[in-house]
């Protein structure tokens, strides 16, 4: 069974903490010995006192260094900076990307909604007949003159026909001012007759 590199790093950190705990125990024993020696009526030799003081200082330095290293590691883990085994930064970047993507989708939907008004479905027969003439007219007319296309979804005639060519003229609104004028003139002539 192979150990994962992250597992070995974590086990090393745990072993370092255990070693620090043992050093703290040794430091407490050393301090207890010094206190007992000072409590005795008999004078302690200078060499023994220096040895006890040096071992105590050495243990304090080791414990302090190891605890500082562990605290620094934990502070990096808490703020999300890169460290061994951390997924906080990756998760944060993923969430940020997802929120950016969703905001882009909503902005795009809003733009499309403002640019293209909703269109109703056109009857297949009407669409085929209108497309041949509409494409030429759209190329010739400026954009600001083009009117939105309106269609009727129910194209039936009174005599039961399919509603193809007879209703083609009435199924879409005029696309330019010229076409509007010609349509109005035709309607005016029909009204007079």
From Swiss-Prot:
Residues 31-68 form a coiled coil. Pfam families: Med11. One of its GO terms (cellular component) is mediator complex. Gene3D superfamilies: 1.10.287.3490. Transmembrane segments: none annotated. One of its GO terms (biological process) is regulation of transcription by RNA polymerase II. Belongs to the Mediator complex subunit 11 family. Component of the Mediator complex, a coactivator involved in the regulated transcription of nearly all RNA polymerase II-dependent genes. Mediator functions as a bridge to convey information from gene-specific regulatory proteins to the basal RNA polymerase II transcription machinery. Mediator is recruited to promoters by direct interactions with regulatory proteins and serves as a scaffold for the assembly of a functional pre-initiation complex with RNA polymerase II and the general transcription factors. This is Mediator of RNA polymerase II transcription subunit 11.
């Amino acid at each position: 069974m192979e150990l994962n590199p992250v597992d070995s790093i974590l086990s090393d950190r745990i072993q370092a903490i255990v070693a620090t705990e043992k050093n703290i125990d040794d430091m407490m024993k050393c301090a207890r010995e010094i206190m007992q020696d000072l409590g005795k009526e008999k004078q302690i030799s200078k060499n023994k006192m220096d040895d006890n003081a040096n071992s105590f200082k050495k243990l304090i330095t080791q414990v302090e260094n190891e605890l500082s290293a562990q605290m620094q590691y934990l502070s990096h883990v808490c703020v999300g900076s890169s460290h061994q085994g951390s997924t906080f930064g990756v998760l944060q970047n993923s969430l940020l990307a997802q929120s950016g993507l969703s905001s882009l989708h909503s902005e795009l939907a809003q733009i499309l909604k403002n640019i293209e008004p909703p269109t109703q479905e056109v009857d297949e027969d009407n669409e085929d007949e209108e497309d041949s003439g509409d494409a030429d007219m759209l190329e010739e007319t400026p954009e600001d003159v083009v009117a939105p296309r309106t269609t009727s979804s129910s194209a039936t005639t009174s005599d039961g026909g399919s509603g193809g060519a007879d209703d083609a003229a009435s199924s879409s609104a005029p696309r330019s001012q010229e076409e509007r004028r010609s349509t109005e003139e035709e309607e005016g002539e029909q009204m007079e007759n």
